[in-house]
């Protein structure tokens, strides 16, 4: 597959992106220059990354250029089915994508994968390639409960799978971060179950990617505080989004994602807690509210590009403000 044909998986190539920016004028993106030649020593202790899922409609080069011009420190790159890099092409495509991201002056502190355990398709090829490129972390997860058997028994069955993944991570010197989700049958939604899976593991190789919004969905009054305290010793990455409760078309109460600062998540308290814990690691911005399909990782979007850019710029500014107020900026 040629590079051009492979890039046509996305809705916009670099040439088309630059034409769009030129036609839209300087208002399309803020005038932030690319910081060429970023080194590990110059990266912030909490690099603020765009989750590349929301830029699936851009090819690697315009995606990286957009992230840099908007002011992000880095990229959390999707290396999974439907992502910027497909698992079956990781050895060919991830080095190219990583090079483009780094040439744009961005950090690549992590990738998001579909890996659940060592038996996941292409798991070892992904880890081998990620390690060779000097990417230190990857997002892992996806365990779910079934109706068969007790929850303690199911957790006991998961522990050997986590231990096996730990050994593969040790081999490649990588840290897997389990992403926390809310919802029925999600392992990790209650947080205490995830603690039982990671508490005896080496945090160099097995850790947590804590999503404070999902934690607030599950326990909005005080439980999110308890789960933060419980898992912070194992937390190597954090994901940020916001929500409020609303009735859906059937009259049922559901979490409704919204721009940062317009929902229920207490970011000021959360970042103060992370400051107290001396947290360092990648922070990933997730934008799950309606953005013409960008929120779902679609490869074409139904809104103007500027709508997505404005949303990312607004949420990023709020993150920067909160981090600075907490002494983390």
List where the protein language model places each region.
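Short, conserved active-site loops that position catalytic residues or coordinate cofactors/metal ions
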Residues: 70-72, 76-81, 106
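Glycine-rich, proline-tolerant flexible connector loops at the mouths of alpha/beta enzymes
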Residues: 78-96
């Amino acid at each position: 597959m040629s590079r051009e044909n492979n890039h046509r998986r996305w809705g916009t190539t670099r040439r088309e992106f630059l034409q769009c920016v030129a036609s839209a004028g300087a208002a399309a993106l803020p005038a932030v220059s690319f910081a060429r030649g970023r080194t590990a020593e110059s990266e912030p202790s909490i690099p603020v990354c765009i989750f590349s899922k929301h830029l699936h409609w851009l090819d690697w080069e315009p995606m990286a250029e957009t992230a840099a011009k908007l002011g992000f420190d880095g990229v959390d790159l999707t290396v999974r089915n439907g992502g910027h890099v497909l698992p079956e092409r990781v050895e060919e495509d991830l080095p190219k994508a990583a090079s483009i991201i780094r040439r744009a002056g961005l950090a690549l502190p992590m990738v998001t994968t579909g890996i659940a355990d060592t038996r996941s398709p292409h798991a070892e090829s992904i880890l081998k390639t990620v390690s060779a490129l000097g990417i230190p972390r990857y997002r892992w997860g996806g365990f779910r409960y079934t109706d068969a058997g007790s929850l303690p028994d199911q957790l006991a069955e998961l522990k050997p799978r986590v231990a096996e993944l730990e050994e593969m991570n040790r081999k490649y010197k990588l840290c897997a971060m389990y992403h926390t989700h809310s919802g029925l049958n999600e392992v990790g939604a209650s947080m205490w179950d995830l603690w039982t899976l990671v508490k005896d593991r080496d945090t160099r190789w097995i850790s947590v990617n804590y999503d404070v919004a999902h934690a607030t969905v599950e326990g909005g009054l005080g439980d999110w505080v308890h789960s933060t305290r419980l898992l912070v010793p194992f937390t190597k990455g954090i994901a940020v989004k916001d929500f409020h409760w609303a009735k859906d078309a059937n009259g049922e109460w559901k979490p409704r994602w919204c721009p940062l600062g317009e929902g229920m998540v207490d970011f000021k308290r959360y970042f103060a807690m992370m400051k107290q814990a001396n947290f360092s690691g990648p922070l990933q911005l997730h934008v799950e509210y309606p953005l013409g399909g960008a929120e779902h990782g679609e490869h074409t979007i139904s809104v103007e590009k500027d709508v997505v850019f404005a949303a990312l710029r607004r949420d990023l500014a709020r993150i920067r403000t909160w981090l600075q107020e907490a002494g983390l900026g």
